[in-house]
Amino acid sequence: MKKIFFTAISLIFILSAQAQDATHDKGVIINGVKWATRNVDAVGTFAATPESAGKFYQWNRKTAWAAEGETVENWDSTYPEGTEWTAANDPSPAGWRVPTRKEQATLLDAAKVTKVWTTQNGVNGYKFTDKTTNNSLFLPAAGYRNDSDGTLSSAGSYGAYWSGTQDALGFYSGNADWNDYYHRDGFSVRAVAE
């Protein structure tokens, strides 16, 4: 009997670990959209925790840029082409993708989702909570990399998350909304389920 019990407990730990490793995420449904609980990190992986910045990406490019350190080398300051983020350039892990603006809009639907600037485990960001299910999603204010030279800016006070359609969800303590940014900027990516 003990052997069966320990085998069952071991299996639970293994399945739990697999559900939240670098390439797997259980996700959370907010206003009908299944969001990853962590930012995209290196191509095809998730950051370690919901508060981790992950990596920054330029719009419709698959090169990952560090979210730490003042400057980076070999920053690509050319303007990306296209009007939609292509699947070939999507840095998300398998089963996930860069969200559309319409999917990002579900987070800002005040009738169905509350948004609150907060600090979670010492990290500033926005917490979006589904009013029906009480599920919540934390987006860290990871800052961004400047379009002209890749200099890190506003970490801890500003967050920007690319959509697949040439704009981004940007926020600071007083507001969260869309803007049409320079596509050469390096922003976070929070994936949605395919």
What is the predicted function of each stretch?
Residues 1-21:
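Bacterial Sec-dependent N-terminal signal peptides
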Residues 22-194:
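C-terminal, surface-exposed recognition/capping segments
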